[in-house]
């Protein structure tokens, strides 16, 4: 029993066998596809710098806003409204925020002189009452400004609300002033300091480099590297109106993108600035009005703590820093090249698809007969036969049958179920072409006295004439030389096969049958060709000659070794061979499955 594994199995190499087709058309297609793939791979390699190892950045941001705004607002004192002018500088309109953000106030509402005491609630929707029963003592509504005392008191001459303990007077629900009080904030400027680090490449840089003009202002075309931005220009870049946004406020994003090439031969690492609005300007303004928040300024008056509540509207600027730094890495280059090598197989896939399509049965039966222009494509059938070797599954039911009066071979892949093999219809299979180089290996006795084309001995197999039938010849026999099978009843149908489909001359009467199948000299030569020291005497030699004759007939009539393995010999040929090389006991086993 052979070993299941050995060192010889380890030290071996397997490769594919290819078929080279000499064709101008397919050669042109191959090189066009190869050059297309090569151009794409090269372009992607250089344009996207796929030979580099990419590293994300680590960033820190610091901002400084500069500018002064004059504010004019209406102030009511003692029932008299008057205009008050004021100045807002950086400390007034900017508030510290966490993270990479800063806030610029553009509008506001004030509630001055608030102190903790009892007062009526502001009569907003759902807050009015008619009696004390509409108020609950100790109730704290999340939408309320304080804690209810349980009393319903007048807010003004027409409306009554629940009394609350809160910062009084309660904040009024006024609309934001139009136009915005700090509408001149569009002229403010902001300086953005951005430091970045690529820890994987051990590289650090920033957006403000030595020698930069500190009095510059950012412009997308004329000064794209300046880190000082005018707020109005930021809105103008994205098509927004600063005056409109300043009324209710909003959220703006300042994007800083770093695409750094850290290779020494083409070093470049500069930021690219862009802007976008981050809040939804189409949201229902009655529910979500812009961006605002409240803060208070506390003070004491006559020993009492008071505050001024400010509802600030403005623009929050979020600075978003992202990007990568790339540097040449041999491993990345090798990985990219390896991943793109499979693209060159596109030519093979396309050409194989063309060959398989034009060699299909549909093209052969429908396209070529009706389209004269497509006839040259029939050469793909030849390419297909050279490229592909069809293999039929070697099942126990597989059998091949050849009739001397038909040009093709029949493949029978079914159970006979008692029906004679002569009458079973199978699938037509083209007869393989004979390799005439094999004829040179035949015995010398086959080379003398060759039949001349046209002589009667060559044409006799094609004549259809009445043949005297043997007394023992069964009904399915067409040549008159077949004999009944000796096999059991369940296997007998396998040997019920004649050499002809229609009545005519038997193939065993041909001269070539005698020279190839029955010639003892030829068969002995074949046996010695395989075993040079074989003893050609004794009882066992007849068995070897008989099986060699079976194989010689199968190889002669079926050509293909795969078909010969499953070939069923006609009854007339089988009995002719058995009579020439008989078995001592006279009992024969019949066809055996080879696998």
From Swiss-Prot:
Task: Name the lipidated positions (S-palmitoyl cysteine).
Answer: 4, 362-363, 374, 377
Q: Which residues lie on this side of the membrane: Extracellular?
A: 47-328
Q: Which residues cross the membrane?
A: 23-46, 329-353
Is Transcription regulation included in the keywords of this UniProt record? no
- Could you say which residues form the signal peptide? none
State any GO BP term from the record: negative regulation of MAPK cascade
Q: Which cysteines are joined by disulfide bonds?
A: 119-168, 129-152, 135-162, 216-226, 260-269
Q: Name one GO molecular function term.
A: potassium channel activity
Q: Which residues lie on this side of the membrane: Cytoplasmic?
A: 1-22, 354-595
Ligand binding (Na(+)): 342
Residues of the region (C-cys anchor) are 360-377
* Subcellular location field: Cell membrane
Q: Which NCBIfam families match?
A: P2X
Q: What is known of its domains?
A: Contains two P2RX7-specific cytoplasmic domains, the C-cysteines (C-cys) anchor and the cytoplasmic ballast. Palmitoylation of the cytoplasmic C-cys anchor prevents receptor desensitization. The cytoplasmic ballast contains a zinc ion complex and a guanosine nucleotide binding site.
The protein's name is: P2X purinoceptor 7
In its UniProt entry, the species of origin is given as Rattus norvegicus (Rat)
Taxonomic lineage from the root: Eukaryota, Metazoa, Chordata, Craniata, Vertebrata
Q: Which gene encodes it?
A: P2rx7
């Amino acid at each position: 029993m052979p070993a299941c594994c050995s060192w010889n199995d380890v030290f071996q190499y397997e490769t594919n066998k290819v078929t080279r087709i000499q064709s101008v058309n397919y050669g042109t297609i191959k090189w066009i596809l190869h050059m297309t793939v090569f151009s794409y791979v090269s372009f992607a390699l250089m344009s996207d710098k796929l030979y580099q190892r990419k590293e994300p950045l680590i960033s820190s941001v610091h901002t400084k806003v500069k500018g002064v705004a004059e504010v004019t607002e209406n102030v009511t004192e003692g029932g008299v409204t008057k205009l008050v002018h004021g100045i807002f500088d950086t400390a007034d309109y900017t508030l510290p925020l966490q993270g990479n953000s800063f806030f610029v106030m553009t509008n506001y509402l004030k509630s001055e002189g608030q102190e903790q005491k009892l007062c009526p609630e502001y009569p907003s929707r759902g807050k009015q009452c008619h009696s004390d029963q509409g108020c609950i003592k100790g109730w704290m509504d999340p939408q309320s400004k304080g804690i209810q005392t349980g009393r319903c008191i007048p807010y003004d001459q027409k409306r009554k609300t629940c009394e609350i303990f809160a910062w009084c007077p309660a904040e009024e629900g006024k609309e934001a002033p139009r136009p915005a009080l700090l509408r001149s904030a569009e002229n403010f400027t902001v300086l953005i300091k951005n430091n970045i680090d690529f820890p994987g490449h051990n590289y650090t840089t920033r957006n403000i480099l030595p020698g930069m003009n500190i009095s510059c202002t950012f412009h997308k075309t004329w000064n794209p590297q300046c880190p000082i931005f005018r707020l109005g220009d930021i809105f103008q870049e994205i098509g927004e109106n600063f005056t409109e946004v300043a009324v209710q406020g909003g959220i703006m994003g300042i994007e800083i993108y770093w695409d750094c090439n850290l290779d020494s031969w083409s070093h470049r690492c500069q930021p690219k600035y862009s802007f976008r609005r981050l809040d939804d300007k189409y949201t229902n303004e009655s529910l979500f009005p812009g961006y605002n928040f409240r803060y208070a300024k506390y003070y004491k008056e006559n020993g009492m703590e008071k505050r001024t509540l400010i509802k600030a509207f403005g623009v929050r600027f979020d600075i978003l820093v992202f990007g990568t730094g790339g540097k040449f890495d041999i491993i990345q280059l090798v990985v990219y090249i390896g991943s793109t090598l499979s693209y060159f197989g596109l030519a093979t896939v396309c050409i194989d698809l063309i060959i398989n399509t034009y060699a299909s049965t549909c093209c052969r039966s429908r396209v070529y007969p009706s389209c004269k222009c497509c006839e040259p494509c029939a050469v793909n059938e030849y390419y297909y036969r050279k490229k592909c070797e069809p293999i039929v599954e070697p099942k126990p039911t597989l059998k091949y049958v050849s009739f001397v009066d038909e040009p093709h071979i029949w493949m029978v892949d079914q159970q006979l179920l008692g029906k004679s093999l002569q009458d079973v219809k199978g699938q037509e299979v083209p007869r393989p072409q004979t390799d005439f180089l094999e004829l040179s290996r035949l015995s010398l006795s086959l080379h003398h006295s060759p039949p001349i084309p046209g002589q009667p001995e060559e044409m006799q197999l094609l004549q259809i004439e009445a043949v005297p039938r043997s007394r023992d010849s069964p009904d399915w026999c067409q040549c008159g030389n077949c004999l009944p099978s000796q096999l059991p009843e369940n296997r007998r149908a396998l040997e019920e096969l004649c050499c002809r489909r229609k009545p005519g001359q038997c193939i065993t009467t041909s001269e070539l049958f005698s020279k190839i199948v029955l010639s003892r000299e030829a068969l002995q030569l074949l046996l010695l060709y395989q075993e040079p020291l074989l003893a050609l005497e004794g009882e066992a030699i007849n068995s070897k000659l008989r099986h060699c004759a079976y194989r010689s007939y199968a190889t002669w009539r079926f050509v293909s070794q795969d078909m010969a393995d499953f070939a069923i010999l006609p009854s007339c040929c089988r009995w002719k061979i058995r009579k020439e090389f008989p078995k001592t006991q006279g009992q024969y086993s019949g066809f055996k499955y080879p696998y």
